[in-house]
Amino acid sequence: MFIKEVASSLYAWDLADEGIATIADNLQERANCNCMYLVGVMHYEKRPLTSLYYTHNTKRKFYLPENSRAYYRLNMDSFKNTKLKSCFTERDFLKGVDWLDVLTEEARKRGMKTGVELSHTIFDTNIAREQYPEMMQRDVNGGIVKDLQGLLCPNHPDVHEFQRAMFYDSVKNHDVDIVQTCLLTFGAGQPVKAPWFFAPWMDIENPSMGAILGLADGGCFCEHCRAKAIKWGYDWERIVHDMKTIHAIAHATPYAFQDYLMENNLTLGSNLTDCMLYIEYPGLLDFIKFRIQSITELFADIYKSVHEAKPGIDFRYNNHVRYPEYTGISFKDIAPYVDSVRESDYSEQRGAPDKFVFKRNTLHKIRRGIGFDKDLISALAVRPNATPELIRESLGVLAQCGIDGLSLGHYDGAHMEHLDAIKQGMSEYNITIVK
């Protein structure tokens, strides 16, 4: 099997603590890496994420990043048409250094590809809530969508322009081959659980209709979404009416929304399909279609901008959700506006109890959507809780899935023997890197 790359993400504090040369040595020699990319704007999330402590960082045991700070230079003229302006790191040991340049300069010395990732949130969500509440996503009842990381509405003109400008400037002013994003799009709400007393005969945590009912808590229902939906020919009043009904069903209990309680219980406890919900509530289907059209429009604008900045750039979407269509992502719709897709399944760190069925299924779903002229990159977990044996087994599965590259998740929490397992597994399953 032939692939184009083995990539690894890195953080600015990794480079500051361990040194880019040491990191690059480890990645090249142990894991066959030929691509490094900086998570240039990182959301608010403790590192390492899946374990208590770092495994090979001699400077610190863990790190608590700032909220959505940029770790490289940006030309602020690029943001003249939006109220939102990028925020930069305020940590003394990181300030004053363009960490993306540090990475790219070392990578080029070694003949490696380079990239930058704009992560889940690319603007400080605390500042957004305090100073720009009108830009936050709204639920069907007009409240700000509840989400741990905060969700800006991509249909708000200032948000849309800020997101476009961030990608454009990152590509225009840096020596990168790839610009990748796992940008949070529309809130999908939280899956609804079945009644507790169904537990003897079903998994109440994962009823088949739980995720789609949870959409009723997602966004966005702001004035800008309303105006755009009407402009595109959607019946906005029907969308709002049907989503309010689904919201009542989703939240029905013996003490609230009682008129919908039996509907809730029988929907969650049955083998009803989402198809029937679309028939009964056409506004639900329109809501999903509108969100997909909105995100496709955003991706089209970003794609055009980054290719104007650098025609050969690889604009890569990093899929990180189980049901992307519930967040506005349709792989068939965005296919013309991406160059590649990374799938962020990390079954290895959970012991792969399903024998990598979900990983296979998801890769096939993405390939079905993007076709065969766009690259498909599969993630592997090299973090604690994975094992060298599982990593090699995963590579054996991936060798059957028609992927175009591998991406390690993530170096900061990796065990060195897990990096070694990448090289070993590639040899065992005849996975070869070609340019």
State each model region's role:
Residues N264-L284, Y317, H364-E393:
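Active-site clefts of carbohydrate-active enzymes
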